[in-house]
Design a protein with these regions (language model features):
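Beta-lactam-recognizing serine transpeptidase/beta-lactamase-like catalytic domain environment
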Residues: 60, 154-199, 205-431, 456-457
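Periplasmic/cell-envelope proteins involved in peptidoglycan metabolism and beta-lactam response
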Residues: 1-176, 186, 195, 268-276, ...
Length: 457
């Protein structure tokens, strides 16, 4: 009897293990099968480590990449270069994470049929990018390193996300032997993976914080003598700006005024608003995640805190994330999260269609409206409306000091205040010098291309 009981327990244990294993397998199959199929080793989806199951087009239907058999890029050399960091190269040095993320959708994978496409034509992925805008940005950057990003802050569609340096995947240069520095960081998607010292574009963050938490800030004035001292240390401006308000301090990008504004806001509030606005958070969309920024004022002296509110100290921002912050201001405190893939089809079947997601409210409507008015004033009084082809641009420039004898990075961020062209943007030109002088001509060409594309849709 004891022997029978013992055997019954052993059989029961084996049965429990078997059932548990089956349940685990079924759970993994239901939740992870798509990832298994699109794993780079899958012969059903990949050819020689490259996804091989369809075509990728831009928003206008231009074929950017045919991956039905081998990798065939656009017939246009400029387009091949301007879209390289999203489509990847043949050897896998530059990944196409967003494309790979939807490989199963392109292949027509489902849990019942597996990888199956009755049409025999493969899938088609449509990106929100415009080849025309990408090429305009590439031309405007003129060989300089950096990134240009533009997205629709109402829908989330990314029209432009250019990274330079780049190269033609059909005419690959000898990068390993290059000693000129021309291709330094060429495999990096700067829009997603880079972080930059923001310089004065960060003053928008400080301005929004001051508007929200400093009583009567609109009645405050700040006097700039060219330097604002903290004992033996000081914050400096290129010239004495005299007496300024918050609005004119932003327009003149007055460091000394913002040092005084920083004192009114205070450390605790600055940390709070940086977190609330999300400007240093990573951002995820379409299977990609951006680099995290940095705002660290722990154990900092007053002068270092002042510089942090000016966009220096150890501040770092990611271009994609900061562009989204600009979009939230344009949207009255709520923006759209960006996305790159508009839709995916397998044969005649729509297997994926993007939907707009919002950032949630990051600031009040009143604060956003005030910041927007200030940024509009910047363009009207400093940068010049004539640069933007009749578009109502709101912006802030930045010249981020790098130290070590390096030339400053040029930054420019903002948005278009127009129902027909709801675009937020960021331009970064590495070692480009002054922000507005360098970036405005780039942005002017890119926004003109965006306008042309949107008018044609």
């Amino acid at each position: 009897m004891n022997r029978v009981t013992k055997r019954t327990w052993i059989m029961g244990l084996f049965l429990a293990v078997l059932l548990g294993g089956m349940m685990f397998f079924l759970w993994e199959y239901v939740t992870q099968a798509g990832d298994w199929v699109t794993f780079p080793g899958s012969p059903h989806v990949y050819n020689n480590a490259n996804i091989g199951c369809g075509t990728v087009t831009d928003r206008s239907g231009n074929v950017l990449l045919d991956i039905t058999e081998e990798r065939t890029y656009s017939s246009d050399a400029a387009t091949r270069q301007s879209t390289l960091h999203w489509l990847g190269d043949r050897k896998g040095y530059i990944s196409a994470s967003a494309v790979s993320h939807y490989a199963g959708k392109m292949a027509g994978f489902d849990l019942v049929s597996g990888v199956y496409d009755s049409s025999g034509e493969g899938g088609e992925m449509t990106l929100t990018l415009s080849a025309k805008v990408q090429n305009a940005a590439l031309d405007a950057m003129a060989g300089r390193k950096g990134t240009v990003g533009v997205y629709n802050y109402k829908t989330g569609e990314i029209l432009c996300a250019l990274t330079t340096p780049t190269y033609d995947p059909d005419n690959v240069p000898d990068i390993a032997s290059d000693t000129s520095g021309q291709y330094d960081g060429v495999y990096l998607n700067r829009f997603l993976q880079s972080t930059y010292v923001p310089g004065s574009i960060f003053k928008v963050v400080t301005t929004a914080a001051a508007l929200d938490c400093v009583p009567d800030i609109l009645d405050e004035t700040f006097t700039c003598y060219g330097a604002y001292e903290y004992g033996t240390e000081k914050v400096t401006c290129e010239k004495a700006h005299g007496t300024l308000t918050l609005k004119t301090a932003l327009a003149n990008s007055c460091n000394c005024s913002f040092a005084q504004i920083a004192e009114l806001v205070g450390k605790k509030n600055m940390v709070k608003y940086v977190e609330q606005f999300g400007v240093t958070d990573s951002l995820s969309f379409d299977g990609v995640t951006t680099a995290e920024g940095n705002y660290d004022i722990s154990n900092t002296a007053p002068v270092s805190f002042a510089w942090s509110c000016i966009g220096q100290h150890t501040d770092l921002i990611n271009p994609a994330r900061y562009m989204t912050f600009m979009g939230a201001i344009a949207g009255g405190g709520v923006g759209a999260e960006p996305y790159l893939v508009s839709e995916v089809r397998s044969g005649e079947e729509m297997t994926y269609e993007a939907k707009t997601k919002t950032t949630g409210r990051i600031m009040s409507q009143d604060v956003a409206d005030q910041v927007r008015a200030y940024m509009r004033n910047n363009v009207q009084s400093v940068y010049g409306d004539w640069n933007f082809n009749g578009m109502n641009v709101c912006a802030k420039s930045g010249t981020s000091q790098l130290g070590g004898g390096q030339k400053s990075n040029a930054m420019f961020a903002g948005f278009v205040e127009d129902e027909q062209y709801p675009l937020a943007f960021i331009v970064v030109v590495e070692n480009g010098g002054y922000g507005s002088a360098t970036c405005v001509p780039v942005l002017s060409k890119v926004l003109a291309a965006c306008k042309s594309v949107l008018d044609g849709e």
